[in-house]
Swiss-Prot record:
Principal EC category: lyase
Binding site for substrate: 24-28, 43, 74, 151, 206, 323
Catalytic reaction(s) noted: uroporphyrinogen III + 4 H(+) = coproporphyrinogen III + 4 CO2
Keyword match Lyase: yes
UniProt keywords, alphabetically: Cytoplasm, Decarboxylase, Lyase, Porphyrin biosynthesis
PANTHER family: METHYLTETRAHYDROFOLATE:HOMOCYSTEINE METHYLTRANSFERASE RELATED, UROPORPHYRINOGEN DECARBOXYLASE
UniProt EC number: 4.1.1.37
A GO biological process held by the record: protoporphyrinogen IX biosynthetic process from glutamate
MF-aspect GO terms: uroporphyrinogen decarboxylase activity
Protein name per UniProt: Uroporphyrinogen decarboxylase
NCBIfam families attached to this UniProt entry: hemE (TIGR01464)
Record PROSITE patterns: UROD_1, UROD_2
Marked site (Transition state stabilizer) residue numbers: 74
Amino acid sequence: MTDKTILRALKGEVLPTPPVWLMRQAGRYLPEYRATRAQAGDFLSLCYTPDLAAEVTLQPIRRYGFDAAILFADILLLPQALGLDLWFETGEGPRMSTVTSMEGVKGLKGKDDIHDKLAPVYETCKILSRELPKETTFIGFAGMPWTVATYMIAGRGSKDQAAAHKFKDTDRAAFSALIDAVTVATIEYLSKQVEAGCEVVKLFDSWAGSLKGQDFEDFAVEPARVITAEMKRRFPGLPVIAFPREAGQGYIGFAEKTGADCVAIDNSVSPDWAAENVQKGKTCVQGNLDPSYMVTGGQELVEATKKVVAAFKNGPHIFNLGHGITPEANPDNVTLLMETIRKG
């Protein structure tokens, strides 16, 4: 029996106190993160400098004692390794060169040619597997093919993923080839993370909610199923957390369809609904406090936290936010969150 509570929850154990970690727990809300990022010079340099990436991963563990650390990286490192240019515009977010044709898909690097660029990420994993406290679970991650493809097609983030939908609907063959290429590369990327020490992998599909009907099945469910099945074939017993953000009704049965051990849910659905329809006493659920409470704090944070814990108490549960913690969050509110959960 492991003493790592997150691994126990992922195996379906119902724990008296849910284990906790937060998406983007290593981030700009922490002064120590801002100092380390300044030392790195820019965001991508931080991702590609193993000592500094490991340091920012460890900072929230030291400060709060979270039950898991998640590798500090970015979902767009993979398309960069596939050969696209990636840069960050101040105040604007990521920008990339684009893939908008079958010719562009064929021009991507092969799955075995991505590792030189990603070698610093694997080195970060090795450092963390040595330095993390023995009770802390180490989570690796990647973006899911649909979400990664939306950036590769548009060259930037967008609210409606219009460019990706247009490509999908006008050149299905090229779009499907792109999804397949990203799927294959994602498996190789995650495999190297696990070989370097990650104990769990999380699949982030941040824009899954924009896929409807059969498209959701084809481009959110199916890639998650393929990736999960192959990762479990290569690494028997490896737990997988899937996060099809804003899937709504699509959360129902997602674990069963994909083989994921846990479904992470956002805060657009209520904890009670998710407990009844997704968790059902047996499926591990991760989530789903509204990140805005990390900004506002106070008694409202305490009550909302207790509500999430109470909703999921009869099944396996990992406490997290419904989305990443924001730069405006107050570090003291995270302390209050942890005290509220741990006191029960």
